[in-house]
């Protein structure tokens, strides 16, 4: 009898691990813990120029989230604000993963807001989008009297965060955010910064095979819910490469060349160029260096530092300070 119970428990556990999105979500969350950032040679000098305000709350009282503020120490006037949504495959990651990079951006004369948001599978689509809108409402109300130029917003994201902010941009352009009016207008967003994001999710769901198919389906179930409950158009709706991007603001797009979404990023650059949206695409051939997913945070690499320099030039071209 006991042997049967043990066997049933083992079988049940294996089936749960195979069919439920929770086990793989937990594993991936652990993989993303701590981020991948490495130090730049001039880190100490850069960090000495900026200040941080950590763990400011936003959102509704029953589901509060938190954001960090990084800005120059010496500031006497309002400045453009970069709002950054972190990556983590929708199930992991943290605002602190962006802190070092945010300090470099702040040293250029920008305020950087790095937000946390509710993670899958506990919270599912479109919760992060609503939380981004909640954060922008919070910043617009400016309870903390931050020196934000709210007419010069830059939306930024890495990995899953890049997909989230690019999707949110579409709703701002249409002025229809799930039947509501977005917190901001398209005129207030001066540019998008997109790092290592997936911009065409539908093919991953419909054409992937083998172990990768199993992994993708578990992650999609974690974020969107079980496939049987997902409207057939959702994967198209969240895939930027299947949408009209002609009214997008200027975009900065980069990706690594090893086990990331470089091909999709290059296609997005081409799409934006075709519709005359100003775009800067930064990519490196594998003959130069093998650059993994989220390489931009690895500032011990010369390519990451080169990308940061190009990003600074892009921001200078598209903001007023």
Regions found by a protein language model. Give the residues of each.
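Alpha/beta-hydrolase superfamily serine-hydrolase fold, recognizing
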Residues: 2-321
